[in-house]
Amino acid sequence: MTLIHMNIIMAFSMSLVGLLMYRSHLMSALLCLEGMMLSLFVLAALTILNSHFTLANMMPIILLVFAACEAAIGLALLVTISNTYGTDYVQNLNLLQC
C-alpha cells in the first residue's frame, strides 16, 4: 500500500470519526459526509488508474453525481429544519418527538 492510499484512507477515517463525534449539528455532519465522499472519489479514481480497468472509468463520475445529490438533499433538509425549528440540531429530525 502506497503512502497516497494510506493518506486517503486516513482522510476517510478522520471524516468518519468527525461524523461520529460532531453529530449534534446537521451542518457538521454534512461536511463530514462530504469529506468521506471526496476521499472515496479520489481512492476510486486512483485505483482505476493504477489497475488500468477501462470498464470502470465512469465509476468516479457516478460517485460524484451521488455526492452532489446527497449534498443538495442535505442542504435542503438543513434549510427546512432551520426554518422550522430555528436550529440545526440532528435531534430535530426525530419524527417521534412530541
Swiss-Prot record:
UniProt GO MF annotations: NADH dehydrogenase (ubiquinone) activity
Statement: the UniProt record of this protein carries the keyword Protein biosynthesis: no
Stretches that traverse the bilayer: 1-21, 29-49, 61-81
Cellular component GO terms held in the UniProt record: mitochondrial inner membrane; respiratory chain complex I
Chief subcellular location: mitochondrion
Enzyme Commission number(s) from the entry: 7.1.1.2
Membrane topology, as annotated: Multi-pass membrane protein
Catalytic activity: a ubiquinone + NADH + 5 H(+)(in) = a ubiquinol + NAD(+) + 4 H(+)(out)
Protein name: NADH-ubiquinone oxidoreductase chain 4L
Source organism of the structure: Eubalaena japonica
